[in-house]
Amino acid sequence: MSGSSSPSLWLAPNPSKRWGELFFLFYTPFWLTLCLGIVVPYKLYETFTELEYLLLALVSAVPAFVIPMLLVGKADRSLCWKDRYWVKANLWIIVFSYVGNYFWTHYFFKVLGASYTFPSWKMNNVPHTTFFLTHVCFLFYHVASNITLRRLRHSTADLPDSLKWCFEAAWILALSYFIAYLETIAIANFPYYEFVDRSAMYRVGCLFYAIYFIVSFPMFFRMDEKSTDEWDLSRVAVDALGAAMLVTIILDLWRLFLGPIVPLPEGQNCLQSGLPWFSN
């Protein structure tokens, strides 16, 4: 993984950001193969207890922090640890995915009819396992979005601003829905993440899930994209919290005005006042 700053239509001009994005891309096959290439197809999860599920998540997520600390990229050797892109990217995703798991999972329960039935230790009725697995998933999704958005901007550089905006908005919408749909399909063979109506989840629920990325992809892209505007960690955290708040507002507006996509079990009222994680 080169730290070179030579021009590229796909890769970041910032050497640290370029190295970080390439690292996250090259790391993705490890956890993806472990989870979807070994554990799920061979049904190893059938013997898992709470501990094994948590260990699987830790083995998937922890190297995203440890490897770049031990194998420092050429582009990062002259930088303080807090100025390295991989640190900032991890922090942004930690904040965003934590809010997503702790709060938005309850929208999946109340609006999409989802449920987790595998053995797990939980926080706010959300498995600890999902906090860690979501982190590496979202790192991959957002880096992939960065690369494609950068390429799109190069392709539309000579167009009027209004057309550039339209192309970018259309791409973000399409990519967000595609990733939401792809993830739903990818975990379909895992029987302990259930939906009341899986076909409704594929048709409509993926659009609900895509809201996460419609907000987060363009916001995450901005971080350290311009060499004259490098972010510090406090700005990274505040930006991620801002993105998370906007997603929360949109999800709750869906809950109140559009309601659930499936009939809810007796006793669950999606349209009640208040917030869904207060009423389990």
Swiss-Prot record:
It is a multi-pass membrane protein. Keywords: Isomerase, Membrane, Transmembrane, Transmembrane helix. One of its GO terms (molecular function) is cycloeucalenol cycloisomerase activity. The chain crosses the membrane at residues 22-42, 53-73, 89-109, 167-187, 201-221, 244-264. GO terms for cellular component: membrane. It is found in: Membrane. Its EC number is 5.5.1.9. Its main location: membrane. Coiled coil: none annotated. The keyword Oxidoreductase does not apply. It catalyses: cycloeucalenol = obtusifoliol. The keyword Isomerase applies. It comes from the Eukaryota. PANTHER family: CYCLOEUCALENOL CYCLOISOMERASE. Converts pentacyclic cyclopropyl sterols to tetracyclic sterols. This is Cycloeucalenol cycloisomerase. It comes from Arabidopsis thaliana.
